[in-house]
């Protein structure tokens, strides 16, 4: 007996009902983004692995443990994208879009990470992604955070989230802080997890993000970044908070919220929820002024962005989305199939969704119409074809009509 074929572990089929919810989430998010001037673009799912090595760092968990990377037939190392930002910045540089700044860009699609599958975390998942390239100053950060708030509000999940906010300060602030953090962590070097022992020499701030309980206990008493802000960093953060207050954005300052990559600066944020267990983050982002230069651009481009998990948003509430209700055309007898096909085509030309059922007993075909929640059935038999009219059954009112084609269009459109 042949084994039943299954999808890869951590990769799920999106069936029509799932896709309906995904489509709705994307549509609402795109509409809100357009109010802020965002335009949609897409990048390839496959990139050269070095695109992500440069942007995320070879010592990051994503690159060292989670990326789907392999040699193609030309012996080039390529990777399935684990996130959008690197590809967007690569596209900005390779397409020479510097003269079009500022740019507000929206993307959506699948991303891939080889992680342990669980509720709200799969190996293939889908994201909404927003990047604001050429975003100068705290006012751009505040606008970006308000965009995130408005998206979650439009999707009716904002009330179940908390905006956690922090400032990573400028490069000088982070450099001073990193020295103090290393001094503190060196006293616990032998107790750190194996991953964090490596991070201690390569990127110690990543230890603050560690999921290890042992590491978390150690960093609970570590120095706090805000103690080492320069005056510039303090002013930037204070300005951001002022703008958020003006916009009515509620937030909680989380001094332990960091980004472990060198190109991140100033604003870092996450929208978290208690409704999804351990997978509590549904949207996260930050300012990344240094990334464009790391990716090969001559100048540093100020930028901020965020990504939201579509599957996680979908898990937060049940969306009751109206489906397109089709009209069913049912020919009575084989000699009426050709005419029924023509009628169905003419109805579609008037933007009326139509399904035509030609095989099986009439009772089964009518049952299919009921299963699809059809409001009307159009019967076409010898008499209807001869008289050039249609027999319409209204399934809600349980009434029948004999109408010509133009009157049929009027009835179907007003219903």
From Swiss-Prot:
Entry GO terms, CC: cytoplasm
GO MF term set: ATP binding; histidine-tRNA ligase activity
Enzyme Commission code(s) on record: 6.1.1.21
Catalytically driven reaction(s): tRNA(His) + L-histidine + ATP = L-histidyl-tRNA(His) + AMP + diphosphate + H(+)
Keywords from the named record: Aminoacyl-tRNA synthetase, ATP-binding, Cytoplasm, Ligase, Nucleotide-binding, Protein biosynthesis
SUPFAM superfamilies on file: Class II aaRS ABD-related, Class II aaRS and biotin synthetases
Record-stated family: Belongs to the class-II aminoacyl-tRNA synthetase family.
The name this protein goes by in its record: Histidine--tRNA ligase
Native source organism of the sequence: Rickettsia bellii (strain OSU 85-389)
Taxonomic lineage from the root: Bacteria, Pseudomonadati, Pseudomonadota, Alphaproteobacteria, Rickettsiales
